[in-house]
Amino acid sequence: MSTAILAPGSRGRRLSKRLLQVVITLFGLLLLTFTIGRVMPIDPVLAIVGPDADQSTYQQVYQQLGFDKSLTTQFGIYFVNLLHGDLGNALLTGKPVVDDIIRVFPATMELATMAIIVGAGLGIPLGVLAAARRNSVSDYVVRIISLAGYSTPIFWVGMMGLLVFYAWLGWVGGAVRVDLGLDGVVPRRTGLITVDALLAGNGQVFWNAINHLILPASLLGFHSLAYISRMTRSFMLAQLSQEFIITARVKGLTERQVIWNHAFRNILVQLLTVVALAYGALLEGAVLIETVFSWPGFGSYLTGSLLLGDMNAVMGCVLLVGVIFVMLNLLSDMLYQFFDPRTKS
């Protein structure tokens, strides 16, 4: 067994190469993020001391932050601090950036998780339907939905969603995670309000959080629905043109069996990759939705940091998004190699 793992072309060797690529990619991302943070036309020293500070105060803070050193030296210091889990302090809160990210990220994760459930739960069946009924009314409707999801600005969708479903109809909660009277009622354990409410056995907070989560998650999931349905349709059309599908139909299998038991089963591995990457994109795309819904998550934190010129926080956020994308990509590759029998040969 060990010989097979070490053999050229084996899954073990491919995984080792992939891990090496991940390390190189993350280092390149770190270097790029640091460089952009230093060349952007934003003065973090001025953001700290304020516009009314005198030159001596400005120069003192400038030296304390290490900006008087070369870029190479600054990057070395930043890299060493990063290895120790230190991303610096945030101007917005005065706390370590790592602590801030740990505090705000669960809110975004909860939103993105619900959004991917909506996007994949609707996008996959719609994509299968469109492929099974190619060039029919159903196919055209699904393609129009997909196009609308790609082209409609998410900020506008969020504003219209709040106006219609909250202000006019009153079907969902407003632009917060829970009602103000229920905020802080359950102890924070995971940062995910729905999970914390379940752990505390508080059904009122749980359903209130769901009521506030439905609208932003559905609107955010609409964009992933467009991508997932389009990719599912493409994968299914490729499978339905294969000879084994024709053979299955000749043998008398029902169309339902052909679609779900043969064609759809063969695209599951590809869909894993699509859904994983869509989930990573949702974590990034949550910035605008969180702004509209006053959602105290990662996106709102990043927006506030950008407006303040807080480069420590911005670089930490950008680095985290990059790490998430790289790790999700690696995970999808590992799942692909594990489940796809063609990678075993």
Predicted segments — roles?
Residues 1-11, 46, 68-124:
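An internal, D/E-rich "acidic patch" concept
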Residues 5-36:
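Charged, compositionally biased N-terminal leader segments and the immediate start
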